[in-house]
Amino acid sequence: HTKIMFLCHNVFPHERFPMDRFLTKKVLEKGDYFIVQSKMDESDLYQIKSDPGVKLTPHPTYNAFRLQNLSRSESRELIRASKDEKILLFFGFVREYKGLKHLLRAMPEIIKQVENVRLFVVGDFGEDRDQYMELIREKKIEDAVEVVEGYIPDKEVEKYFAACDLVVLPYESATQSGIVQIAYGFRKPVLVTIVGGLPDVVTDGKTGYVVES
C-alpha cells in the first residue's frame, strides 16, 4: 500500500477541544513514517504507535526573514525605540499557554532592576486582548510596554527582531517554537521556560537562558 509520512509540528494540540486526542490518534495511526521536532512530540507519538518509524529533527534556524539586513539602529528607528533602551520582545500569536501574563506581572520588578527597559508585545491577540490590556493598566506599566497588535507580515518581522536585545518565551506548555529559530536567525538570545522541547534547543548561558516555568 502507499506509504504515508506525517510531519508533526505538534502531535497533540496545545489547546484542547472535544475529541481532539481521539481524532488525532485515529489519523496518526494510519502513518508509516513520522518527522517530529522535539523529544516531547516523539514521546507523545509513542502513546499512539508502539513502533513508529520516527525521525527527530528540530526546527532549523530561520534566516528567511532577513530581507533588508537592517542594522540595530535602523530597526530601532523604525519601531521608535532609542539606542539606549533595553528591548524585550514577545512575538507571535498571543495564547493563554504562552504565558504572557506572567511576563507582564514580572515587568514591575524588571523595571526596578533594569534601567530603561521596554517590552514589545507583537502579534495577534484573538479574543483575549482585554485581559492583557487590563493587566498592563493594573501593574501601571503602560510606559514600559509597547503593544503592536495584529498579524505581522514577513516583511515586517525583521525590524522587531533586529531591534531587540532578548526574545522572551514565558510559555506554560510547548513542544517547540519557531520563534526560537527566528531569534537565532537574527543572532538574538532567548529566554525560555523548562517546558516541552524548548530547553532542547537552548544552551543555557550561551544561546539564551532556561528558567523554571
Residue ranges, per PLM feature:
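Donor nucleotide-sugar binding/catalytic pocket of nucleotide-sugar-dependent glycosyltransferases
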Residues: 29-70
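A short helix/loop element that forms part of the nucleotide-sugar donor recognition site in Leloir-type
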Residues: 66-81
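Conserved donor-binding/catalytic core segment of Leloir-type glycosyltransferases
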Residues: 82-98, 104-107, 120
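Glycosyltransferase donor-sugar binding loop
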Residues: 91, 118-133, 150
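Nucleotide-activated donor-binding/catalytic signature segment of Leloir-type glycosyltransferases, i.e.
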Residues: 132-151, 155
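Acidic donor-binding loop of glycosyltransferase active sites
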Residues: 159-177, 188
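Short hydrophobic beta-strand element within catalytic cores of glycosyltransferases
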Residues: 189-192, 202
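Conserved acidic donor-binding segment of nucleotide-sugar-dependent glycosyltransferases
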Residues: 204-205, 209-213
